[in-house]
Amino acid sequence: MNTNVLPPPDQKAEYVERMFSRIASGYDTMNGIMTLGLDRGWRTATVALAAPPSCGRALDIGTGTGDFLVELAQWMPDGLAVGVDFTLPMMRAGLPKIAGQRAVFVAGDALALPFDDESFDAITTGFTLRNVTDIAAAFREMWRVARVGGTVACLEVARPRQPLLRFGHWVYFQRIVPLMARALGADPEAYTYLPQSARVFPPPDELAQIMREAGWSDVTYRLVGLGAAAIHTGIKRG
């Protein structure tokens, strides 16, 4: 049985920063393996739902090594894609990806974004919110820096609703993924934390309500990956 590695709330931010610093160099490889390569299509769908204008400004929160940043830059050939993260080694690992792109990394915290009000036309975030200490505060910050009419698209973990799929999902992420991490020389604690954090993350309906209470309008979501993930969207109304 896996040992619980989830940190107490007052230690979570420091724990997460240290963990992602440790796994930065192999994160992309392990992430692709862990999601069976489906994460690429999910990111593309998320950016399409955010649909930033071609000459606009888009922000990716918890950008990590910049996979979303690349998608956003390609969507906006005359715009600017900004990725913010508080784990510097992750962004350093992603620098080769954004070479030649209209994209930049910025150090910052999702709960205190280093940007002025109404700075961005679209905001994306992927597999980030389960790592923050206050999901509602993160959505309020997104709302603050979004322009009126701006969009948010959030890709996050979910759990399949069909019982057999849910059981298979549990076995894969709670048992198989940590073993794969060990076999591939990845950090076993990190790849125990990731599925455990997903297990306690709010379900899609609850996350949608958190978004509404943070100020977002027209909130909806779609399930992807047989219900293993969800893409939530919203609009900032005047």
Curated annotation (Swiss-Prot):
CDD domains: AdoMet_MTases. Methyltransferase required for the conversion of demethylmenaquinol (DMKH2) to menaquinol (MKH2). SUPFAM superfamilies: S-adenosyl-L-methionine-dependent methyltransferases. The gene is menG. The keyword Methyltransferase applies. Keywords: Menaquinone biosynthesis, Methyltransferase, S-adenosyl-L-methionine, Transferase. GO terms for biological process: menaquinone biosynthetic process; methylation. InterPro entries: SAM-dependent_MTases_sf (IPR029063), UbiE/COQ5_MeTrFase (IPR004033). GO terms for molecular function: demethylmenaquinone methyltransferase activity. HAMAP family: MenG_UbiE_methyltr (MF_01813). This is Demethylmenaquinone methyltransferase. It comes from Roseiflexus castenholzii (strain DSM 13941 / HLO8). It catalyses: a 2-demethylmenaquinol + S-adenosyl-L-methionine = a menaquinol + S-adenosyl-L-homocysteine + H(+). S-adenosyl-L-methionine binds at residues 65, 85, 109-110. Belongs to the class I-like SAM-binding methyltransferase superfamily. MenG/UbiE family. Pathway: Quinol/quinone metabolism; menaquinone biosynthesis; menaquinol from 1,4-dihydroxy-2-naphthoate: step 2/2. NCBIfam families: MenG_MenH_UbiE (TIGR01934). Disulfide bonds: none annotated. Its EC number is 2.1.1.163. The keyword Heme does not apply.
